[in-house]
């Protein structure tokens, strides 16, 4: 993330589909700061959690081979941090901080540059970062898309196969927001900003309401 990634309020959200559960599987975030992931030494592989400067998890278990919408919402004014699944709040905790600085490495489907094992085994779509605390209704009603010009939309990666382009040997996923924070698509080892850039695989997304 760039130097503007300093948040007094924040929302992570994504559509996720797990092929296989394994320990420490990252959805998105900044390791050691604020990360949204599955599993840990004390958290089962099929349980989602928030870790970093605030840490907690719901008791809810997820099923493999099923689409879910997940969201992490932080409001610095109250320090309340909440986890939502398909628009329903499933856990909350009061953080010890009132802001987050995510300037630096931020990954989707990957943890950090020196542990290539903590990758996402599955699919994702509609990955977004907001500089506002989204409400339950906003999360529930906009799972499959939002207006790219929405107030507070910090970064928006649809991952739908139409937003990928290649430049100078790398593949990028276009940021659909007005902020031009395009993401680099990588696979395998990632060291100090370097690694194999690959074209993302695209599958049909089928959701049963």
Set out the residue ranges of the language-model regions.
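Extracellular glycan-recognition modules
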Residues: 1-47, 77-84, 115, 131-139, ...
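Short surface loop/edge beta-strand patches of beta-sandwich-type extracellular domains
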Residues: 1-10, 54-61, 112, 142-148
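Short tryptophan-centered beta-strand motifs in secreted/extracellular beta-sheet-rich domains
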Residues: 65-74, 83, 128
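Short, aromatic/His-centered strand-loop micro-motif at the edge of beta-sheets
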Residues: 46-69, 114
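Extracellular beta-strand elements of beta-rich domains used
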Residues: 14, 70, 124-129, 175
